[in-house]
Design a protein with these regions (language model features):
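A short, acidic, flexible beta-alpha connecting loop/helix-capping segment that sits on the rim
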Residues: 157-160, 173-177
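Residue-level signal for well-ordered, solvent-exposed loop/turn and beta-edge residues enriched
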Residues: 40, 72, 128, 150, ...
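Residue-level recognition of beta-strand microenvironments
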Residues: 44, 74-76, 132
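ABC ATPase nucleotide-binding domains
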Residues: 1-58
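Short, Lys/Arg- and Gly-enriched loop/turn segments at beta-strand edges
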Residues: 110-114, 175-181
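A short, hydrophobic beta-strand micro-motif
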Residues: 35, 100-105, 164-172
Length: 181
């Protein structure tokens, strides 16, 4: 049905307002989406931008699954629970911001490795698999970075099998982490 609605929209080239609670349907059928919270518009954007660059915690949590990671912006770095990253790695998202900041990072934008990745341009942290669930198309993992109270959701292809309790390396790419308002 999603593709038929989109086809009709494109064929007749008309403006339509379509109200739905089905996120997948909204992403397929829309040129722009308005996300509302308690009767107030939180963000209006194209589906790709809304999903990949949400502006607020509400929008990030409403559209798809995400991990919220609390941090503190200092002069030249961003300090997380157990690790720090140079502020310049965040593509200018933090320009002019200091103090507490919350990041959103989608589960599919975190990678898992059985050994420390070599030559990675991202950030690699030691961690441990806390839980896992096989869902056919992918593994759904809960991982804990070492020396941190964080728990991160990570989805990985079915061929990437890690056991609960196994030590792993967690790959984060700062450019895939969105600073929220």
């Amino acid at each position: 049905m999603r593709f038929e609605i989109r086809r009709l929209h494109d064929e007749f080239r008309i403006t339509t307002v379509y109200v739905t609670h089905d996120q997948g349907e909204a992403m397929v059928t829309s040129d722009r989406i308005a996300v509302m919270n308690a009767g107030r518009i939180e963000q209006i954007d194209e589906p790709f931008a809304l999903y990949n660059r949400p502006r607020t915690r509400f929008v990030a949590g409403f559209i798809g699954r995400t991990n919220f990671i609390e941090a503190r912006r200092e002069a030249n770095s961003v300090s997380f629970d157990g690790f720090a990253v140079p502020a310049g790695r965040f593509n200018g998202e933090l320009d002019g911001r200091t103090g507490a900041v919350t990041f959103s990072v989608r589960p599919q934008n975190i990678s898992l490795h059985g050994s420390q990745p070599a030559g990675t341009d991202g950030l690699a942290l030691p961690g441990k698999i806390v839980e896992r669930a096989y869902l056919g198309e992918f593994w759904d993992y809960v991982v804990a970075p070492a020396d941190s109270a964080l728990r991160l959701r990570v989805v990985a292809p079915p061929r990437e099998v890690f056991e609960a309790g196994q030590n792993v390396w967690i790959g984060l790419a700062p450019e895939q982490m969105t600073a929220l308002a």
